[in-house]
């Protein structure tokens, strides 16, 4: 009796080991294609610059940074890639791979291959990158995620506006008068050495003249080391209150959301909202409709570069 129990436990452990060794199956069978060389050096949907010599891939729903293992079902060859782009948008394609991954799968001549997709260990992807650099000394060095090192740029840093925790007014700079009804307590902060514009923080209980929604990423700003005045509320149109936050809860301490009145005001500024990862595209569209019913209007636009889906959120106008 004891021997039968030991055999049963050993069989269960063996099956579990084989399951974890194989990895989680994402797609048992689908078609893979690879990027044309003309895309090399262009930005991807994640913001990275596409490198055809790195082991990367594009998928419609998998989160950026996901590491998967592809197996060519016709010849048994495997490769580990990292998702850093969106696509492909052909009806019968499941994934797009870089040229380096296509060479590893031996699919350059055919252009398309039947593959299976399994979830992989990120450490295995890093090991594959190191081995490839040893065999291909002409390829630029890359980090553990397969991204070539980039030189620091002078672009403006990302700024976050928090109406609940305004920064203290620096010594020697003009601050607004607290306690005056209807007047926002603002601080004139000069543009930094990166050329980023100042951000106005509203005191609790007052109506801010401008509250950035989400994360605003300036496209280009001229360097300026002098203080710039905060725009007055008369130059902006009044917007309806936003009743729900991004997580579904009520918004507290925020009276209104700034709404652009013309396209020139949003030039160089892009709001990116990532709602989550979905296996099916219709599930993502269903969430967009749900958010629209909660007074959060999401405009999905297909970008020209690698067909990246971007969402722009605005409060509805009254």
Curated annotation (Swiss-Prot):
An annotated GO BP: peptidoglycan metabolic process
GO MF terms held by the record: lytic endotransglycosylase activity
Signal peptide positions (record): 1-21
Keywords for the protein's UniProt record, in alphabetical order: Cell wall biogenesis/degradation, Lyase, Signal
Top-rank EC class of the record's enzyme: lyase
Residue segments, region Disordered: 121-191
Keyword flag Lyase: yes
Compositional bias per record (Polar residues), positions renumbered to this chain: 125-137
Pfam family, one: DPBB_1
EC number annotated for this UniProt entry: 4.2.2.-
InterPro entries: RlpA (IPR034718), RlpA-like_DPBB (IPR009009), RlpA-like_sf (IPR036908), RplA (IPR012997)
Function summary: Lytic transglycosylase with a strong preference for naked glycan strands that lack stem peptides.
Family: Belongs to the RlpA family.
Protein name per its UniProtKB record: Probable endolytic peptidoglycan transglycosylase RlpA
Protein's organism: Treponema pallidum (strain Nichols)
Gene: rlpA
